[in-house]
């Protein structure tokens, strides 16, 4: 028989599975957004990325004197476990949900907070000691943490894609050498045209993919500009001075990617141009 614990928010009390690392906000989202059946935990790159974002935020808040030593260690450890994939099964919010990612952000905040509580010897849901909002989500908003997470996830997935394309290029090169002396007819306008080697055809495939890799990498670099520290609408309300720059630096150190703070956070917060441009590279590669 499933056991439950009671958690509360501004709406009221709600039963949450006792062994769940998520909390009341996630439980409400699970009940409210039964749309696709595909959960955010089905995207390990996203979960890993949000773990990095929350870890960078915790380090930044600690450096600026907002997060005490007693919370930095357990929150950091919880974030690292999220990054390692230990809690993918706890990210149960539907991939399509209202609020521009608020439910997913809270899913992460609650999982990290409850794991931190556990590490400190407290019961899950005892948010007086470690709060999903006041501590894990400190100096953040869904509107900067969520898009930064998506950008990092795409960067990681782009690297994986490029690795696979490089393997395909290597295979094409090998075939190019293998069939270097095999003559075939080249075709134009659906008709035989002039002779070529089968090896030349495979070499052309390889060259084409090399161009696609260059375009993918160039376009993915646009995701390195983030709006952490902009909070809700880019004005930086509730984030301390210096937070944006330091958070980007911390995220860069953690991931090895050269993240920088956007020049204008108000503009950057709603901007989706980088996704459009990167999508064009994916479409070109597919064609």
Residue ranges and their predicted role:
Residues 1-287:
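Conserved, well-structured ligand/cofactor-binding cores
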